[in-house]
C-alpha cells in the first residue's frame, strides 16, 4: 500500500529534549498545511527548509506544541516519497498528541520498519543497506557499528555487484554459443572454466567472513569453567569491574549461570560464570554441572580456570581430558600465592596453548587476559583482512546457493556436457545472488526482515 500516507514517532520512547514525528506519502504536504501555522505567516513551504510555528489539533484548533517542521519532496527523501518531519518537545504526551493529530488528518500508523521498506521499494537503498539501518540502530560495540556502517555505505552491495558482473560475463559466453553456434566463435573451454574457478574462489572468500561478521554483529559467548573455588566468580567480577557474582570461601557457592556482556576491543563478549565441575551426589549440583557441559558445547570460547596454588589432581586431569578439543584458553588463577601448579602439565593436556597466570583478587594479568579472549573468539571465527564482511545468515545461505550453482556449472563443463546445462546453473546462480540485494527477494522475506525494525524507522 505505497499510495497511502504513513506516520510514526521516530524517536525512542520516554522523555527528552526533542521528539520527532515522521510522515511519508502523497498527503505529507497537505497534512503540514492543515496542522501547522508558521510564526512568520509562511504558506508556501520550500523543501529542506526548517520552519518555526505552532502545531494544532485539527478538530479543536487547540495548539499542541511549538514546533519546527521540514518538508522533503519526492524523490529526494529517505523514503523516496514526500516526507514531513515534525520536531516537537520530547514529552510522551506531546509526541502522542502530535501523532494523533497527524493520524486524524489522513495518515495511518506505520508498520515496523515501513519507512525503510518504502526506501527499498522506491530504489533509494538496496536490501543490504536496509538491513544495515537496523544493525546501526542495534549496534552495541564499535566493531558491530563499523560493520553496519560499511553495509550502509554500500560496500557489500558493490562486492555483490562485482560478483554479479562476473556471472553475467560467463552467462553471455555460454548463451551466445548456444543461440549463435554458427555465427559466434565459442571461447576456449579453459577460458570459461578459468572464470568459473575464479568466481568460486571469490564466493568462498566472501563466505569465509561470515563467522567473523556474526561475532561483530551478535557478539561472542565465553564460558568460565573449572573446579569449585578456583576463583571463577572473582574473575568474572574482575573482568566486569563490578561485584556481579557472589564470592565466598565456600566451594560451590555458584550454582546458576551468571552472565554479563563486556566490550573487548570493540567486540561484545558475553561472559558466563558457571558452577564448579566436580563429582557430587547433590542432585541440584549434578543438574547444574550437566548444564555447564551444555553451555560449553555451544560456547565460542572457554576459559579453563585452574588454582595455581595447588597441584593437579586425578580429578583435575579427568576434567582436562574431557575439555580437549574445545576452543579453550587455560588460565591459572591465584598468581599472588605460592605457585604449585606446573605449566608443563597443562601444556601436556592442551598442546600449543600458553597458560596465562592471573590474580583475580588483585587484577594482575587481566589486561592481557582480555587480549587473549579477543584472540580466542576471533581466531575461531577466522579473522579476515578484507574490507567487506557478511554478518547475516540470509546472506550466507544465498551465497552458498550461488556457489553451489557455480560448482555445478563447472562440473558440467568439465564432464563435457552441453553448455545449456552450465547456462541454466549460471541463471540460477544469478537468481540466488540477487536475493542478497533484494533483486529477486520475495514478500515473505521482506516481511521477516522489516518486522524486526522499530516503528518509525
Curated annotation (Swiss-Prot):
The keyword Chloroplast does not apply. The gene is mnmE. Pfam families: MMR_HSR1, MnmE_helical, TrmE_N. Its EC number is 3.6.-.-. PROSITE patterns: G_TRME. It comes from Syntrophus aciditrophicus (strain SB). GTP binds at residues 229-234, 248-254, 273-276, 333-336. Keywords: Cytoplasm, GTP-binding, Hydrolase, Magnesium, Metal-binding, Nucleotide-binding, Potassium, tRNA processing. This is tRNA modification GTPase MnmE. The keyword Iron-sulfur does not apply. The lineage of its organism: Bacteria, Pseudomonadati, Thermodesulfobacteriota, Syntrophia, Syntrophales. It comes from the Bacteria. Binds 1 potassium ion per subunit. It is found in: Cytoplasm.
Amino acid at each position: 500500500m505505497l499510495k497511502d500516507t504513513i506516520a510514526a514517532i521516530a524517536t525512542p520512547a520516554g522523555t527528552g529534549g526533542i521528539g520527532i514525528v515522521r510522515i511519508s506519502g502523497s498527503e505529507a504536504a497537505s497534512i503540514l498545511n492543515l496542522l501547522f501555522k508558521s510564526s512568520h505567516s509562511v504558506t508556501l513551504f520550500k523543501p529542506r527548509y526548517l520552519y518555526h510555528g505552532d502545531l494544532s489539533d485539527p478538530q479543536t484548533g487547540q495548539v499542541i506544541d511549538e514546533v519546527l517542521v521540514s518538508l522533503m519532496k519526492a524523490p529526494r527523501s529517505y523514503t523516496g516519497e514526500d516526507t514531513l518531519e515534525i520536531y516537537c518537545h520530547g514529552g510522551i504526551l506531546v509526541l502522542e498528541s502530535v501523532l494523533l493529530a497527524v493520524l486524524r488528518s489522513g495518515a495511518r500508523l506505520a508498520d515496523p520498519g515501513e519507512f525503510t521498506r518504502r526506501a527499498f521499494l522506491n530504489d533509494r537503498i538496496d536490501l543490504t543497506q536496509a538491513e544495515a539501518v537496523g544493525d546501526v540502530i542495534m549496534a552495541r560495540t564499535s566493531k558491530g557499528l563499523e560493520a553496519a556502517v560499511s553495509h550502509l555505505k554500500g560496500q557489500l552491495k558493490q562486492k555483490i555487484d562485482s560478483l554479479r558482473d562476473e556471472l553475467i560475463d560467463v552467462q553471455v559466453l555460454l548463451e551466445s554459443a548456444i543461440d549463435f553456434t554458427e555465427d559466434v566463435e565459442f571461447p576456449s573451454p579453459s577460458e570459461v572454466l578459468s572464470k568459473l574457478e575464479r568466481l568460486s574462489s571469490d564466493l568462498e572468500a566472501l563466505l569465509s567472513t561470515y563467522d567473523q561478521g556474526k561475532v561483530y554483529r551478535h557478539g561472542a559467548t565465553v564460558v568460565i569453567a573449572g573446579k569449585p573455588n578456583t576463583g571463577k566468580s572473582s574473575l568474572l567480577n574482575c573482568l566486569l569491574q563490578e561485584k556481579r557474582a557472589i564470592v565466598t570461601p565456600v566451594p560451590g557457592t555458584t550454582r546458576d549461570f551468571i552472565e554479563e556482556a563486556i566490550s573487548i576491543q570493540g567486540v561484545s563478549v558475553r561472559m558466563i560464570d558457571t558452577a564448579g565441575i566436580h563429582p557430587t551426589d547433590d542432585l541440584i549440583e549434578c543438574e547444574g554441572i550437566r548444564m555447564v557441559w551444555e553451555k560449553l558445547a555451544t560456547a565460542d570460547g572457554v576459559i579453563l580456570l585452574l588454582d595455581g596454588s595447588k597441584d593437579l589432581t586425578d580429578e583435575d586431569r579427568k576434567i582436562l581430558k574431557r575439555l580437549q578439543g574445545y576452543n579453550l584458553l587455560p588460565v591459572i588463577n591465584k598468581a599472588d600465592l605460592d605457585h604449585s601448579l606446573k605449566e608443563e602439565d597443562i601444556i601436556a593436556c592442551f598442546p600449543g596453548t600458553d597458560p596465562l597466570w592471573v590474580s583475580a583478587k588483585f587484577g594482575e594479568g587481566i589486561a592481557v587476559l582480555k587480549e587473549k579472549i579477543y584472540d580466542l573468539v576471533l581466531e575461531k571465527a577466522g579473522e579476515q583482512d578484507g574490507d567487506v564482511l557478511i554478518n547475516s545468515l540470509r546472506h550466507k545461505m544465498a551465497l552458498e546457493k550461488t556457489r553451489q550453482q557455480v560448482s555445478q556449472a563447472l562440473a558440467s563443463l568439465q564432464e563435457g556436457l552441453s553448455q545449456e546445462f552450465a547456462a541454466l546453473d549460471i541463471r540460477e546462480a544469478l537468481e540466488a545472488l540477487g536475493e542478497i540485494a533484494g533483486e529477486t527477494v520475495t514478500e515473505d522475506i521482506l516481511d521477516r526482515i522489516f518486522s524486526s525494525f522499530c516503528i518509525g524507522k
